[in-house]
């Protein structure tokens, strides 16, 4: 592990072999399990949907890129939503235009790539399971035309809400998992073999799934003293991981945009979680952790 400091400012942590980093934080409790997705409105592409109003919703896309707006998008415990897409490279953007957060307490599956946008917040509960080729959960929005043009630039409202994962996210080989918001907390398991994992906190985030940069985060969202989790507890960091992030043969990046006067850690790394990127054959694992602010990363253990 190499930690670089310039003029007292921690710039980044880069690990290019087998890495195990332990993280600290508290695990939130969950007071709701959500409903099933309601009122789909297709904005782009060809889509057919069956099982509306039941515990098993099936979304069948007929084009490589689709955009669907929903009044709400949650999956209750025991519920299941399947996105059946033309190929593993097909991408479906799903945006919540109502006023309720998304709670994934059941199963969310796809043979392709999924994006879930909800400015009210996204929560994957301990029973929640996401199994896709790629998965992006964000409280920052993306312009429809940018999405269709492969320009994955996300913008927030100035005080964007958080993305919290306490469940299990499994990404197919070579895919990506991205959790983006004003703050991000992971106490679950995120696995992306030969793929990429990105946790980003800020008001402007750009994802690059092709190049080595993966993610650029700019524009701070909150002062930490004003951010609370779902239980009302004040958060100690913009990105907090007490679970497992694992991308063997791939890349993991954690980055938060903060004000220069921030007194608490932007990225919290402690003793109860792990960040793992082990090399596979000729493919090394890589981890990048950091932000431009002073005392931005805290490592314990």
Language-model segments: residues:
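Extracellular and secretory-pathway beta-repeat/beta-biased strand scaffolds
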Residues: 2-301
